[in-house]
Amino acid sequence: MVSSQPKYDLIREVGRGSYGVVYEAVIRKTSARVAVKKIRCHAPENVELALREFWALSSIKSQHPNVIHLEECILQKDGMVQKMSHGSNSSLYLQLVETSLKGEIAFDPRSAYYLWFVMDFCDGGDMNEYLLSRKPNRKTNTSFMLQLSSALAFLHKNQIIHRDLKPDNILISQSRMDTSDLEPTLKVADFGLSKVCSASGQNPEEPVSVNKCFLSTACGTDFYMAPEVWEGHYTAKADIFALGIIIWAMLERITFIDTETKKELLGSYVKQGTEIVPVGEALLENPKMELLIPVKKKSMNGRMKQLIKEMLAANPQDRPDAFELELRLVQIAFKDSSWET
């Protein structure tokens, strides 16, 4: 159904990325708060990123508390709006798909095309901002590790490889914190680089394992990229590596300064002289390199240290999959009360 009346009122801008602007918004009928990511489809790259995010989030048939939920996607053209669905025969939707496939605008460039992603509103910023504005806290670290491993297992079960896991892409929801004893809820977001692994050609009914779905496009953020991503031949095990970088950095409060934004970011790295080098890049050059874990603290629980080393193994086959990772983190968190000492 096409309408000239949007269902949402945009309240304020809360974030701006390379291909979209995120607003706090309210649903007119209910006054409920939501987040709206508004993406201008003026370039093929924007369209491709937007469709990747739409396809990934719309492919998920159930919700997970630690994965951002897509309420709906709205396509706006010259003031008219319509709800967009995956596989739609709408000419507007098909023009966007054609633009993504051909790498050139397949519609009248004089028309103003926008996609609105309506999602959960997260009121606590991102994981990077949240952690770096507070003192290290063992309970928070435990909660965040368990939430992130649960989210990743859920995504991989749904054949989704995120490909850009980093603290900036993990949002914080504090609205359900009824008491000061509760930790905030994390939500993995920003699926613009994600990949949905399709069923195998031999048996279309059987979903393909994300750990056997090989990808070749080198993408992500360099300090969180696995060595095989730099090479351009990788699977979902690259997400395990990225999460290993995040967990290691969180436990030891390892940070670096982004050269472009000058922001302090959580992320582990390797020092080579006076330079800091992404762990994945260093392991690509020297796969036998022994990572110094812990690098700042005097000691670390043996099982936690071993798990991080396995997550950051140069050979992806030596890393645990998301389901083993989730189980082992639960065991470490609940069977060893002093795991972080």
UniProtKB/Swiss-Prot annotation:
Gene3D superfamilies documented for this protein: Phosphorylase Kinase, domain 1 (3.30.200.20), Transferase(Phosphotransferase) domain 1 (1.10.510.10)
Signal peptide range: none
Q: What is this protein called?
A: Serine/threonine-protein kinase PDIK1L
Domain named Protein kinase is located at 8-334
Family designation: Belongs to the protein kinase superfamily. Ser/Thr protein kinase family.
GO CC aspect terms = nucleoplasm
Entry annotation: catalytic residues: 164
According to its UniProt record, the EC number is 2.7.11.1
Q: Where in the cell is it found?
A: Nucleus
Coiled-coil stretches, from where to where? none
